[in-house]
Each structure stands twice: as structure tokens, then as C-alpha cells.
Amino acid sequence: MIARILSINANDLFCEVNHELKKLHAPGRWKHQKINLAPNDLLELNDQGEIIKLIERKNYLNRPKVANLDHVVLVFSIKDPQLNLKQLFKFMVYFESQLGFKPLIVFSKLDLDHDQNEFKKIVEALEQINYQVFKLNEPDDFLRLKNLLFNKVTIFCGHSGVGKSTLLKRLDNSLDIWTQAVSAKLKRGKNTTTATKLYKFLDGYLVDSPGFSIYDLNLTKQQLSCGLIEFAQYQTKCKFNDCLHLENSADCYLKKKINSLIYQIYLSVIKSII
């Protein structure tokens, strides 16, 4: 049998086993072996329902702690709150450097008044370096996003007020029912309010991590300079391995090749920490 960890509270592992919620405990020796478990870890069970093995992870995110992700969805509004490209860039760097794949980028509140030409340039710049961009005011984009997330494990990230909750309910209107069922099962005290949990979502799973914030990232200049997949492929062609790709960086290959708008966003981010 296989168990999927939905949430962890101290030594209690709340898992889904054969479509039922079960409370399991890791073998005592795992603590001494420093085997640290995370939500969405898959566990092999014996016939008695005891944990015997942690199935190898395909990826792992350190903050919030979660394993085996298929998609990261970054939700940013065009206004209210105003689109912050520096924060978007930081999210992109963080998730790509940790997981090795590009997040999906969703823009909301496009019905509000905004500079359409400027927004078009942003979308084109992101698509030029192979990001999938979704505009929630376009039905085809919404359907394309929904199809991509079907039967997958997904985490959504975005600041308060960008419309993330509305989007989730629009994607899967049964989410509230499952959320209430799991929350009742996992009710174990005040610490669970910020604990990472998994909920059924589009025949897959939604990772809910209410305690996670962009302000927790503390990215270094080295992470920023090569964290994006697109940046990493150019980093090796720069004259210096530790090139920061600044305007005065000698023989920097990246600044010759990368989209100019993306490069300007990068400069504004890295200059804020050096």
C-alpha cells in the first residue's frame, strides 16, 4: 500500500491511504537516521498498515516544506495590488533553483484599467524565455490552465488580494468540501493554522501553505545571478564563473542574449542587495 502525507503535526502523519484519511507514525529509528518527512511524501506500507519505506522524491521544496511537486502557479494582479515585477522575479528564481522547473504565471484583475502596451511587453518577454503565461480574463487561458493542473500536485503563490482564493474555487468548486473534511480531521491545536496541508484538487492535490511569504526568501546575489533556468544556461558562457551580469561585468554573455526587459528587472533586484 502507498500512503500520501497530507499534513504533519509533531509526530503525527495525517495521510491518505486508499482514499481514506489515516493517522500514521514514522518508525522510531527514522529520527536517529535523520529522515525528515514532508507533506506529499509517499510512503510504502506493509500489510499491517505500518510505514516501511519513504519512496524516493522527484523534487523537494525547503520552504514551504513539500515534496514531489508537479506545478507552481504564481498569481499576480495587474492592479490592486499593483504588479510588482521584482517580486515576481524573486519567486521565479526561488522555485526554479529549488525545483528545476519553471513556474506557471497567472495574471489577474485584467479588467481593471492598466497600460495594455506595457503589459503586452511583459507577457512577450516572459514567453520569449519559455514561461507559460495565463490571463484570467481570457476563457481559453483559463481552460488551458485547468487542463494543465488536472491530476497534478500544485502549489499556488501570491500576495493577499490578487484573487488566488477566487481562482481556486473557480478551478474546482468542490475544494471547500474537501478542505472542511481534512481540516476537521487534522484539528490538532493552534500550530496547524500555518502548517502546510494537501487538499484534493482537480483529481490531484493542492498544497496550501498559509505561512509562506516572499519576504522569507532571503535570496543571495549568487542565487539571483544563476537561479533562473534561462540564466543558468548562459552563466557557463560568461568569462567568470561568478559573473553577476551587471552593466560593467566583463565579457558577460548573458546580458547580450537575455530579453532586455527581463534583464532590467534582474538588475533592479540584484542592485537592491549588493
UniProtKB/Swiss-Prot annotation:
Binding, GTP: S108, K109, L110, D111, G158, H159, S160, G161, V162, G163, K164, S165, T166
Listed EC numbers: 3.6.1.-
Keywords for the protein's UniProt record, in alphabetical order: Cytoplasm, GTP-binding, Hydrolase, Metal-binding, Nucleotide-binding, Ribosome biogenesis, RNA-binding, rRNA-binding, Zinc
All copies of domain CP-type G, residue ranges: 58-215
Pfam families linked to this entry: RsgA_GTPase (PF03193)
Binding locations of Zn(2+): C238, C243, H245, C252
EC class name: hydrolase
An annotated Gene Ontology molecular function: metal ion binding
Cross-referenced SUPFAM superfamilies: P-loop containing nucleoside triphosphate hydrolases (SSF52540)
GO CC, alphabetical: cytoplasm
GO biological process: ribosomal small subunit biogenesis
Chief place of localization: cytoplasm
Cofactor descriptive note: Binds 1 zinc ion per subunit.
Entry-linked CDD domains: YjeQ_EngC (cd01854)
Protein location: Cytoplasm
Named cofactor requirement(s): Zn(2+)
Family: Belongs to the TRAFAC class YlqF/YawG GTPase family. RsgA subfamily.
PANTHER family in alphabetical order: SMALL RIBOSOMAL SUBUNIT BIOGENESIS GTPASE RSGA, SMALL RIBOSOMAL SUBUNIT BIOGENESIS GTPASE RSGA 1, MITOCHONDRIAL-RELATED
Assembly, per entry: Monomer. Associates with 30S ribosomal subunit, binds 16S rRNA.
Function noted in UniProt: One of several proteins that assist in the late maturation steps of the functional core of the 30S ribosomal subunit. Helps release RbfA from mature subunits. May play a role in the assembly of ribosomal proteins into the subunit. Circularly permuted GTPase that catalyzes slow GTP hydrolysis, GTPase activity is stimulated by the 30S ribosomal subunit.
Name assigned to this protein: Small ribosomal subunit biogenesis GTPase RsgA
The species this protein was found in: Mycoplasmoides gallisepticum (strain R(low / passage 15 / clone 2)) (Mycoplasma gallisepticum)
Gene name, Swiss-Prot/TrEMBL: rsgA
